[in-house]
A protein has these predicted regions:
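Non-DNA-binding regulatory cores of transcription-related proteins
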Residues: 120-122, 149, 168, 174
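Active-site capping/gating segments
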Residues: 170-208
Length: 208
């Protein structure tokens, strides 16, 4: 199974979750041939570079049932779709300013039977809803992201981790994180996933 790498790090998946993860390979290959949401050279690394990378967020927080999460700039559905599979009792809204990409996310979510995932063609500035967490993957510098999504963070807490932004990023982030140095937390993904690709990849958490 292509999704064996997911099972390696998340051994407690249900049969439904395993099936949903397995279906992603064919679905993303088919859609990527029509609408480019993953670079052509990277599609063979879908599970490691996109699905497992998205699930790194689950290594720093187990979202409680009923948690509302906004995936800002989801592209073709990352990190939102893998997280929605892993946390079926949470609600995910996936937004992106590019309609073609959101169509892919919607079609994939429909095909695997995700009921807790709402993709919408929308710019972040226009999102009015309230969420416990905003997640993103290499969308924009953290200070810019925070300016846009601060309005969307709910004041009501229901998780062990205070509400805020969780962002997947790579490389040297010192300058980007400096404005938040007193409260931001950076975790190396290589702490959890041993594949070479995850070196210099980080989970950035900022309570808001």
């Amino acid at each position: 199974m292509a999704a064996d790498i997911i099972l390696k790090y998340f051994p407690d998946l249900t049969e439904t979750q395993q099936r949903q993860f397995d279906m992603l390979d064919t679905l993303y290959r088919d859609w990527n041939a029509k609408i480019n949401v993953i670079s052509r050279k990277d599609i063979d690394q879908l599970y490691e570079h996109h699905v497992l990378h998205s699930l790194a967020i689950a290594k720093i927080i187990r979202f409680r049932p009923g948690t509302r999460i906004l995936d800002f700039g989801t592209g073709g559905g990352f990190p939102g779709i893998p997280l929605a599979i892993l946390f079926p009792e949470c609600q995910f809204k996936l937004i992106d300013g590019t309609g073609k990409k959101i169509r892919v996310a919607q079609e994939v979510a429909n095909a695997i039977g995700l009921k807790n995932c709402e993709p919408e063609h929308l710019r972040g500035e226009d999102e009015k809803g309230k969420f416990d967490f905003v997640v993103s993957r290499a969308v924009m510098p953290l200070p810019d992201l925070v300016k846009i999504v601060r309005k969307n963070i709910s004041k009501t807490q229901q998780n062990a981790l205070p509400n805020g932004v969780i962002s997947l990023k790579g490389g040297d982030l010192q300058a980007e994180l400096r404005p938040f140095y007193k409260i931001v937390e950076s975790t190396d993904i290589s702490t959890f996933f041993k594949e070479e690709w995850f070196k210099e990849k980080h989970i950035i958490y900022l309570p808001i």
